[in-house]
């Protein structure tokens, strides 16, 4: 999904309709698009006027995050990377975003893969990952399930450093956890 950049002069609805039609063999009619847009904005409890505003221009942090999920819902990618989608969301907005992510996971099943990056357990409590990985210097150093998130939440990352004997440089102290919420395995056998 695109980064939440402001694009003056391009309305949210024009951007989304163009992006949706670029992914389809036959373009959506205006009626079909409006129906899909209305349904998705209603699911995300977004103001319907958002469609007529310029893309991300003047959007609050929460509106940008919901707009990213709106794009995901309408574009229906096979794979999505949500980088700190919980950043700047209040409790209610986080629940709405998580509910919409879970709905996509439920309805798309094996046709949708998702990687979420967050520094906070609260997102992972609402969107339960199937796999959890801890990265240091771009390398996966620890893998597990939800219990790994609980351990990190309770003990921090200090145990990772001690257990694996990892010495982090000052600029490398930002360890990031990633929860993979779905994956599709294919084989060429």
What residue ranges belong to the model's regions?
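Short beta-strand-to-coil loop within P-loop NTPase ATPase cores
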Residues: 1-7, 118, 135
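ABC-family P-loop ATPase nucleotide-binding domains
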Residues: 2-78
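Walker B catalytic motif
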Residues: 81-88, 92
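Conserved D-loop-proximal element of ABC-family nucleotide-binding domains
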Residues: 90-95, 143
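Conserved catalytic loops of ABC-family nucleotide-binding domains
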Residues: 100-120, 124-126
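Conserved catalytic/dimer-interface elements of ABC ATPase nucleotide-binding domains
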Residues: 115, 131-133
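Conserved beta-strand-loop-alpha-helix hinge in the C-terminal portion
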Residues: 126, 135, 139-164
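ABC-family P-loop ATPase nucleotide-binding domain
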Residues: 154, 160-189
């Amino acid at each position: 999904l695109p980064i939440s950049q402001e694009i003056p002069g391009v309305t949210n609805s024009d951007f989304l309709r163009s992006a949706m039609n670029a992914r389809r063999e036959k373009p959506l009619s205006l009626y079909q698009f409006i129906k899909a847009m209305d349904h998705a904005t209603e699911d995300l409890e977004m103001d319907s006027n958002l469609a007529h505003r310029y893309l991300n221009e003047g959007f609050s942090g929460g509106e940008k995050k919901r707009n990213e999920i709106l794009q995901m819902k309408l574009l229906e990618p096979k794979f999505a990377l949500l980088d700190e989608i919980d950043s700047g969301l209040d409790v209610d907005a986080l629940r709405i975003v998580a509910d919409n992510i879970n709905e996509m996971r439920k309805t798309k099943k094996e046709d949708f893969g998702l990687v979420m990056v967050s520094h906070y357990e609260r997102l992972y409590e609402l969107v339960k990952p199937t796999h959890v990985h801890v990265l240091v210097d771009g390398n996966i150093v620890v893998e597990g399930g939800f219990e790994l998130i609980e351990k990190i939440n309770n003990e921090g990352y200090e145990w990772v450093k001690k257990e694996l004997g990892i010495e982090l440089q000052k600029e490398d102290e930002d360890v990031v956890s990633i929860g993979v919420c779905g994956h599709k395995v294919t084989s060429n056998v």
